[in-house]
């Protein structure tokens, strides 16, 4: 069934009790496009959204119109020429739980725990020159080690605790 709304958005897919239920495709006034599962008029289950204004794509699980459980988000910044990728757990539309966050072309890679969209808990941030391993809170390393790479495979270890190098 296809429904066209007054704002020119539309839904095409399965319906139950006059509500979007099952597989469906929708184009929204914002320009966003969604294809996937619906439950009682909500994006719920597995699906893919292409964001028009954020230059991004999310593919994964949804619950009540929010990213939830496991998924992959890729978005780009045309101003800074950066590509961001997150693969991992989501809760209430935020990166939350275990995941991997990559920024290219700089090759920043964070592998670890997230809370409410920020690095929080145990994790390792890898850069081209060094790595930061330890406990993170609200996106900042609180306690851990910094390993500085040299041109050879050897590296120097530096301990880090409460914003102090030791």
Task: Give residue ranges: language-model regions.
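Surface-exposed loop/turn motifs in large extracellular/passenger domains
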Residues: 78-83
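Beta-turn initiation residues at beta-strand->coil junctions
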Residues: 3-6, 25-29, 48-53, 72-77, ...
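Conserved anchor residues at repeat-unit boundaries in beta-strand-based tandem repeats, strongest
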Residues: 10-21, 33-44, 57-68, 84-97, ...
């Amino acid at each position: 069934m296809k429904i066209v709304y007054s704002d020119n958005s539309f839904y095409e897919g399965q319906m139950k009790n006059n509500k979007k239920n099952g597989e469906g495709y929708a184009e929204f006034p914002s320009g966003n496009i969604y294809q996937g599962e619906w439950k009682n008029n909500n994006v719920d289950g597995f699906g893919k959204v292409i964001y028009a204004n954020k230059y991004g794509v999310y593919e994964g699980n949804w619950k009540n119109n929010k990213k939830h459980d496991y998924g992959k988000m890729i978005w780009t910044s045309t101003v800074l020429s950066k590509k961001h990728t997150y693969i991992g757990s989501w809760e209430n539309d935020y990166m939350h739980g275990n995941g991997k966050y990559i920024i290219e072309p700089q090759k920043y890679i964070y592998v670890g725990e997230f809370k409410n969209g920020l690095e929080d808990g145990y994790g390792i941030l890898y850069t081209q020159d060094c790595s930061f391993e330890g406990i993170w809170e609200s996106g900042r390393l609180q306690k851990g080690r910094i390993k500085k790479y040299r041109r050879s495979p050897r590296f120097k270890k530096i301990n880090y605790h409460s914003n102090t190098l030791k």
